[in-house]
């Protein structure tokens, strides 16, 4: 089952939990206090570069004849669309640049180059997902309603098709996000008129988006309309797949924990911080790939501070790593390919009923709870007043459990041999 008592699972005392919150609050204050011209210049350069790349890509597609020109133009267009969606649309929509008071670069005015309506996405994502990250039955992003990513989600026959659903979701990700936002808006609407209004808003946005990419821009290419159309289709599909990989690795990889609704009862800010740290995962890439991911390779930092500028996440990550080390908490990260393979493994194996799975629901790679440590002799050492930060926390508890498990297997193997 999923985690109910987050502090118990993390092996933190009440005093440690409060101290953790103080340290993370200090990081927020430091970044907020140091925002300035360098940050605003960064986002303006990014907008200018993205628009230049978008125009250049379309000129290459329309102005060249061979396959090489089409491939180069389509690649550039894919990159431009990825930057617009992730480093711009996603992060501006989080209010990361609202402090600039620039009406163009503001969460309330920016409309992204995607099928969904930005305002609908902001409610489903910024509130329902970020406030209730990985809480089963509350966070709609947990499997997006089509994937079973924890054993706490009841198995159904339709889950057998999960590997195929996974591929289709990746290819159609922007349309899935659009439908996801509409679903959230319908749930909070109180009248049929409100539901109708948000539905028509989405239909209009989808029509504009499809008309731009698949009718208007190809028509501008005249006799080369097929070349432009296929490039736009390919760029949108590739952007969708990339966005899906980034998001899936940040939430479904091993180590990104899930929580029961009971974990929300009386939740304090330090407990919210802790849930975000345990419920997300990073992946390791260089600065270029980090930029192309919208700096969402720093998913842990993004969930701790979703409204701080994305260009500061690398700096924040160094301090968050230190906090995790101080409290013996895992800092879940790994190479991008490895993180996605772990995600795909989870999606594939949870397509099967639980009776075909070997690990328990309290101690599986994708699903764990505080029960994995109960009735186990794991000494707990809190920090004392001497400044000694050595402790036995979650990282140590997991390591000790793995050692005991391997020891039991070794003993069992030796006994069987005799």
Task: Enumerate the predicted regions with their spans.
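Low-complexity, highly charged intrinsically disordered N-terminal segments
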Residues: 1-56
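Transit-peptide-like, low-complexity N-terminal presequences
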Residues: 1-20, 362-418
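Polar-ligand-bearing catalytic/cofactor-coordination segments
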Residues: 9, 24-41, 252-283, 305, ...
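Catalytic cores of phosphodiester-bond-cleaving enzymes
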Residues: 36-41, 58-65, 418
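Glycine- and acidic
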Residues: 39-42, 107-111, 196-201, 223-228, ...
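Alpha-helical phosphate/pyrophosphate-handling elements in metalloenzyme active cores
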Residues: 46-72, 216-221
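Hydrophobic transmembrane alpha-helical segments that form the core helix bundle
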Residues: 71-81, 132, 136-276, 281, ...
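Membrane-embedded catalytic scaffold of the fatty acid hydroxylase/desaturase
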Residues: 78-196, 264-354
């Amino acid at each position: 089952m999923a985690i109910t008592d987050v502090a118990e699972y993390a092996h933190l005392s009440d005093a440690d939990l409060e101290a953790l919150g103080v340290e993370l609050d200090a990081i927020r204050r430091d970044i907020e206090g140091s925002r300035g011209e360098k940050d605003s210049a960064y986002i303006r350069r990014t907008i200018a570069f993205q628009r230049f790349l978008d125009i250049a890509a379309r000129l290459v597609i329309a102005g060249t004849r061979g396959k090489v020109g089409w491939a180069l133009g389509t690649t550039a267009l894919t990159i431009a669309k990825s930057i617009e969606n992730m480093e711009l649309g996603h992060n501006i929509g989080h209010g990361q640049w609202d402090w600039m008071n620039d009406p163009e670069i503001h969460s309330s005015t920016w409309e992204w180059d995607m099928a969904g309506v930005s305002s609908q996405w902001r409610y489903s994502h910024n509130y329902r997902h970020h406030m209730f990250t990985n809480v089963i039955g509350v966070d709609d992003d947990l499997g997006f309603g089509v994937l079973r990513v924890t054993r706490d989600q009841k198995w159904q026959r339709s889950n057998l098709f999960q590997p195929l659903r996974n591929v289709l979701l990746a290819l159609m990700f922007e349309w899935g996000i659009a439908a996801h936002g509409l679903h959230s808006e319908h749930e909070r609407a109180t009248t049929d008129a409100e539901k109708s209004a948000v539905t028509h808003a989405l239909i209009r946005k989808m029509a504009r988006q499809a008309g731009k990419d698949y009718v208007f821009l190809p028509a501008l290419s005249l006799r080369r309309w097929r070349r432009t159309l296929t490039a736009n289709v390919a760029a949108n599909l590739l952007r969708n797949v990339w966005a899906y990989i980034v998001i899936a690795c940040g939430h479904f990889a091993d180590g990104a924990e899930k929580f029961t609704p009971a974990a929300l009862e009386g939740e304090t800010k330090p407990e919210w911080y802790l849930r975000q740290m345990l419920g997300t995962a990073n992946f390791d890439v260089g600065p270029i790939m980090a930029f192309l991911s919208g700096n969402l390779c720093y998913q842990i930092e993004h969930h701790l501070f979703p409204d701080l500028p994305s260009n500061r996440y690398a700096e924040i990550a160094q301090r968050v790593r230190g906090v995790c080390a101080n409290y013996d908490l895992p800092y879940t990260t790994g190479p991008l390919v490895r993180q996605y393979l772990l995600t795909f493994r989870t999606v594939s194996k949870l397509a099967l009923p639980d009776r075909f799975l070997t690990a328990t629901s309290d101690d599986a790679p994708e699903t764990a709870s505080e029960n994995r440590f109960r009735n186990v002799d794991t000494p707990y050492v809190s920090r004392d007043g001497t400044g000694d930060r050595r402790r036995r926390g979650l990282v140590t508890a997991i390591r000790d459990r793995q050692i005991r498990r391997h020891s039991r297997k070794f003993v069992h193997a030796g006994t069987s041999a005799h």
